[in-house]
Curated annotation (Swiss-Prot):
Protein family according to the UniProt entry: Belongs to the peptidase S26B family.
One GO-annotated biological process of the protein: signal peptide processing
Pfam families found in the cross-reference section: Peptidase_S24 (PF00717)
Gene source species: Candida dubliniensis (strain CD36 / ATCC MYA-646 / CBS 7987 / NCPF 3949 / NRRL Y-17841)
Stretches the record annotates as C-terminal short (CTS) helix: 152-163
Any one GO MF annotation of this record: serine-type endopeptidase activity
InterPro entries for the chain: LexA/Signal_pep-like_sf (IPR036286), Pept_S26A_signal_pept_1_Ser-AS (IPR019756), Peptidase_S24_S26A/B/C (IPR015927), Peptidase_S26 (IPR019533), Peptidase_S26B (IPR001733)
Protein name: Signal peptidase complex catalytic subunit SEC11
Annotated catalytic residues: 44, 83, 108
Entry-linked NCBIfam families: sigpep_I_arch
Subunit text: Component of the signal peptidase complex (SPC) composed of a catalytic subunit SEC11 and three accessory subunits SPC1, SPC2 and SPC3. The complex induces a local thinning of the ER membrane which is used to measure the length of the signal peptide (SP) h-region of protein substrates. This ensures the selectivity of the complex towards h-regions shorter than 18-20 amino acids. SPC associates with the translocon complex.
Keywords assigned by UniProt, alphabetized: Endoplasmic reticulum, Hydrolase, Membrane, Protease, Signal-anchor, Transmembrane, Transmembrane helix
Lumenal compartment segments: 31-166
Free-text domain note: The C-terminal short (CTS) helix is essential for catalytic activity. It may be accommodated as a transmembrane helix in the thinned membrane environment of the complex, similarly to the signal peptide in the complex substrates.
């Protein structure tokens, strides 16, 4: 393989990654959310959503109501949580929410930060669920939880780049 083919392959790969990044950033701006697409990682929302479902979020100046399914993040925790709004209150121009997983026995108070009794709609919410695709996100769960699957996928990608003729 000559240098021109190597440069072409590198540029093609860079094009794929930059296109994916631009698509992600465009979705982020449109949905007004730093993470417009999330994968359900647990069974706390069954039967509404199963583990591995991909959720599409929207966060454009809307008030949540009881029954809405929201995704939120807590300070100090890296994994977003998908749960349903159980109660909502208004306090000094801000909306406060209490959430609970459909498959959980109790509300999410124990998941919130210390001394936090409600979620702040503006500060804690990533978005409201507007749509989903079932089970497609299971690949990301397999990659994060199974080391052999992760290295197998990396190996296949490496082999495919070595043996491609273009």
């Amino acid at each position: 393989m000559n240098i021109r083919q190597q440069i072409t392959q590198f540029l093609s790969l860079a094009y794929v990654f930059s296109s994916a990044f631009m698509l992600w950033k465009t979705l982020s701006v449109i949905a007004n959310s730093h993470s417009p697409i999330v994968v359900v990682l647990s069974g706390s929302m069954e039967p509404a959503f199963q583990r591995g479902d991909i959720l599409f979020l929207w966060n454009r100046d809307q008030q949540q109501k009881v029954g809405d399914i929201v995704v939120y993040e807590i300070d100090g925790k890296t994994i977003p949580i998908v749960h349903r709004v159980l109660r909502e209150h208004h306090n000094q121009q801000k909306q406060l929410l209490l959430t609970k997983g459909d498959n959980n026995a109790v509300d999410d108070l124990s998941l919130y930060a210390k001394k936090q009794q409600y979620l702040n709609q503006k500060a804690d919410l990533v978005g409201t669920v507007k749509g989903y695709l079932p089970f497609i996100g299971y690949v990301t769960i397999l990659i994060s939880e199974n080391v052999y699957f992760k290295y197998g996928m990396l190996g296949l990608l490496g082999l495919s780049s070595l043996f491609s003729n273009e």
